[in-house]
Amino acid sequence: ADIIEAYRMATEAMRRREPCSIAYHGNIVDLLEYAEREKILIELLSDQTSCHAVYEGGYCPAGLTFEERTRLLHESPEQFRHLVDISLRRHFEVIKKLVARGTYFFDYGNSFMKAIYDAGVKEISYNGVDEKDGFIWPSYVEDIMGPQLFDYGYGPFRWVCLSGKHERSEEH
């Protein structure tokens, strides 16, 4: 779906109070900037890009196709890094505006807020200077799972077995 169609489908599903899954092929920054411009309320928002490897291709800068991103990543890593930083700053600014209008945003634990900080946005840190006190938005674990399950660094869930083979889960 394109941006307009994606939001139309989401709005219609919400009106009907029905679950809906929409595949949007594009950049999240463009999608969120459209929502902000059009005053579309996003109630719950997170980010699941691979920001633990933001400059190694885990984040595709707004304005580039995936193919352009891949070419630039290999041919001009410094230019790629520059475009990632610009896009991360735009990403932060639009999320900040959406949060001010009522969106609940949380970091999914993918180093998104750290990547924004590394892109030069000190405002994302609690103290506005460095990352030692954490960031302004909560992470999924600390804010959603943490209050009941993981406050003390441990909880009822220890291992995830992605193979689906029970014997693998017993190795740990």
What is the role of each PLM region?
Residues 1-158, 165-167:
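Glycine-rich phosphate/ribose-binding loops and adjacent secondary-structure elements
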